[in-house]
Swiss-Prot record:
The keyword Lyase applies. The gene is ALDOA. In vertebrates, three forms of this ubiquitous glycolytic enzyme are found, aldolase A in muscle, aldolase B in liver and aldolase C in brain. Plays a key role in glycolysis and gluconeogenesis. It is an enzyme of class 4 (lyase). Its EC number is 4.1.2.13. Keywords: Allergen, Glycolysis, Lyase. This is Fructose-bisphosphate aldolase A. Gene3D superfamilies: Aldolase class I (3.20.20.70). Coiled coil: none annotated. Pathway: Carbohydrate degradation; glycolysis; D-glyceraldehyde 3-phosphate and glycerone phosphate from D-glucose: step 4/4.
Length: 37
């Protein structure tokens, strides 16, 4: 399931890259979105 079905593949990739940076060890914050599903 995609949270942003209206985004282009390029935008999805950019968000994915950002998300991985956010959850990387020692970087950013750990966020768990349980509002879907």
């Amino acid at each position: 399931p995609h949270a942003f079905p209206f985004l282009t593949p390029e935008q999805k990739k950019e968000l994915s890259d950002i998300a991985h940076k956010i959850v990387a060890p020692g970087k950013g914050i750990l966020a768990a979105d349980e509002s879907t599903g």
